């Protein structure tokens, strides 16, 4: 983004931001799977790897954000004012996804490292379809951002909202089970409940990220569209 042409800088900035959002979304999907696999399989190695990689990703995100902010300051002022909100919403969403991974990872790593009782098979069986649906939607989101084609964005957002409702139901079911379960499985049950809570939060975060990308890449965002975004979760 060393060009002196403001319009060219805007084009390059949009490409750079797309690459940032899609790469962090893809990293989150892959690492989320790695963490939950490590917990369900009682395998400490992938959990340790995820811990180290996520710290590195946080450092890299700060570097990318600094570069993009410099680019934002060099585009036409009217466009910069319009895009500022969506840029920061997208960047903050990337950061929040990494924090969400850490909040899932830490209890899983501690649980496996201490050789506590494993999660019940019934919980795994109900969780895996939810995880697959989450990953499928995140992949669709990556595809929309990579191609800069948001034709399916509304459908993705709707299915994401439906997924949040499914996870909410599982959370309630899990809390009911915990009240009736033996103390021997309580620790694993608490970790699983945390996974469900953070998974629900993760859905909210990447839905924000998709909206942010769509509005940042758009040539014009109407006040009505902006108001719709501010009223949604």
Predicted segments with their positions:
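Cytosolic, long alpha-helical scaffolding segments
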Residues: 1-233
């Amino acid at each position: 983004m060393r060009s002196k042409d403001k319009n060219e800088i805007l084009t390059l900035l949009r490409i750079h931001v797309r690459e940032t959002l899609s790469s962090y979304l893809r990293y989150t999907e892959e690492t989320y799977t790695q963490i939950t696999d490590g917990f369900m399989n009682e395998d400490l190695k992938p959990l340790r790897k995820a811990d180290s990689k996520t710290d590195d990703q946080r450092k890299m995100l700060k570097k990318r954000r600094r570069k993009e902010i410099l680019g934002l300051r060099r585009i036409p002022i009217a466009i910069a004012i319009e895009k500022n909100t969506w840029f920061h919403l997208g960047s903050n969403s990337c950061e929040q996804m990494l924090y969400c991974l850490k909040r899932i990872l830490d209890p899983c790593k501690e649980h496996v490292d201490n050789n506590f009782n494993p999660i019940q098979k019934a919980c795994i069986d109900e969780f895996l379809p939810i995880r697959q649906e989450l990953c499928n939607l995140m992949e669709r989101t990556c595809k929309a951002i990579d191609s800069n084609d948001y034709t399916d964005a509304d459908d993705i957002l709707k299915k994401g909202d439906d997924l949040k409702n499914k996870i909410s139901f599982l959370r309630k079911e899990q809390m009911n089970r915990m009240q009736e379960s033996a103390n021997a499985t309580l620790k694993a049950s608490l970790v699983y409940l945390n996974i469900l809570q953070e998974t629900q939060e993760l859905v909210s975060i990447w839905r924000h990220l998709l909206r942010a990308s769509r509005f940042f890449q758009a040539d014009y965002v109407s006040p009505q569209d902006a108001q719709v975004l501010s009223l949604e979760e």
